[in-house]
Amino acid sequence: DEAAVEKVAHLRFPDPAPCGKTPLRAAGLSKAYGSLEVFAGVDLAIDRGSRVVVLGLNGAGKTTLLRLLGGVEEPDSGEVIPGHGLKIGYYAQEHETIDTDLTVVENLRRAAPGMDDTQVRSVLGSFLFSGSDADKPARVLSGGEKTRLALAMLVVSSANVLLLDEPTNNLDPASREEILGALGTFTGAVVLVTHDEGAVEALNPDRGLLLP
């Protein structure tokens, strides 16, 4: 895999789609699973271009918060309020944004319907899916390959708010550096959940949200 690692292209996220001053807000979010209350009364405003890192112990509900913000789950109370022009890019730690019934290239086409085949394959090449790799069914991908595909889908989405749940897990060192470099130059808003101190450094957050 050494040769493959050498080929990681210099990634950059495209310019985010235009949006209002506060593309995403949450008010009074609460969530419980059965009798287990995950969190209650969470308020959050994500301004255009802001960088927020979500902190908290394991089980504090960091992943759950991103799922609520991304519309994957509904809160028990409170609301998520989309602002003008909101376009979310959600990176799920469990890769559930990937459709395992589709091939790698079909997943990327779905994420960027406006791109032609040459552009799609070029993006996949920069994420180390070249030639026949791009035509593999997503269900046979390794954890690291799924991470690379999910990140490729984010890159083409022109999202203006990225919700990232442990985006550097399963990545080889060279790919991790590229992703962190791309995040550092991204001009949209980012909400990051991570145990990777290097990722927090690269993001250079404006603030942290501490879940109890």
Predicted regions mapped to residue ranges:
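ABC ATP-binding cassette signature C-motif
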Residues: 16-212
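ABC-family P-loop ATPase nucleotide-binding domain
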Residues: 1-25
